[in-house]
A protein has these predicted regions:
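Conserved catalytic core of the tyrosine transesterase superfamily
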Residues: 1-173
Length: 173
């Protein structure tokens, strides 16, 4: 359950693995369907989440997380913060621990072991652009100060470029 929530949130939010490790249960607004991330330079950003990511995360919080705490023979803090991703020992998982889990899951799925969690961030940005999101919105979602940084994350396919010309150029047919 924890792994499913981790993968869903990585893809749904475009977060860095270090941002994911820093998440608390309180980082999620269920009513607003958003996730509060703290990026580089302690910059805060709020990212909307889709239903599948929320459901996977809720299931983990309600079923998987308490089980991990019980196995570790620990008690959850009364007044928070409540780390979202915890280890079998009941401690907050570090970015390195989450990265190892990611690599293990990739290997189990038959994906080359050299893939990095950061690939999910690239995929997030590319899929948004392919789906019609504007570059400025993607910049905000990724938490980039510079638009040129966001452009590095994008992988425009030849089909996307053809569609852009066909839709936007006066003679593009």
């Amino acid at each position: 359950l924890r792994d499913a929530a981790m993968l869903e949130l990585l893809y749904a939010s475009g977060s860095r693995i270090s941002e994911l490790a820093a998440l608390d249960v309180e980082s999620i607004s269920w009513s607003e369907r958003t996730l509060r991330l703290w990026g580089k330079g302690s910059k805060e950003r709020i990212v909307p989440l889709y239903r599948c990511a929320l459901e996977a995360t809720r299931t983990y919080i309600e079923e998987g997380r308490p089980e991990l705490i019980a196995k570790a023979k620990r008690r959850d803090a009364e007044n928070g913060p409540h780390p979202l991703f915890i280890s079998a020992r009941g401690n907050r998982m570090s970015a390195a621990m989450l990265r190892r889990r990611f690599h293990m899951l990739a290997t189990l799925a038959g994906i080359p072991a050299d893939i990095a969690p950061h690939a999910m961030r690239h995929t997030f940005a590319t899929d948004l652009l392919e789906g019609g999101a504007d570059l400025r919105s993607v910049q905000e979602l990724l938490g980039h100060a510079s638009l040129s940084t966001t452009q590095i994350y994008t992988h425009l396919t030849p089909d996307r470029l053809k569609r852009a010309v066909a839709q936007a150029h006066p003679r593009g047919e």
